[in-house]
Amino acid sequence: EITTEPEGTLESMINANLYSAYHTTRGLITIMKENKTGHIFNMCSIASFTAYSNGGSYAISKFAMLGFSKCLRAELKGFGIRVTAVMPGATKTESWDGTDEPEERFMKPEDVAEAVFSAYSLSPHSVVEELLIRPQLGDI
């Protein structure tokens, strides 16, 4: 909950989930523009477009990441650079360690990777702008 988060949580989440991608991408865009090719995948989240209780700073940072992805798409499409916002739901990673949720409520990381590779494998004439992947049993 936003009102009970420790001081500095928002800054930490923005640093991890937005600024790191922002600065890395800025460092690579020049060469992508020169080559007139490239594909940027930004790891967003279901939290990028769906607010939920206890989402707090994490959700805020992921909303920002989706906005960043949309800006990049608009700015770079004329250079042949594709941009995909990847928005996975609950995926069985370390962030869910200790949860009581049964394993079938989660996607496998390999499923997300395969979906990303499928988007990457399209011809240069197509782009998956937003890749939304959810567990078969729905969001947690």
Label the predicted regions.
Residues 27-36:
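A short helix-coil junction within the Rossmann-fold of NAD(P)-dependent oxidoreductases
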Residues 88-98:
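Short, flexible catalytic-loop segment of classical short-chain dehydrogenase/reductase
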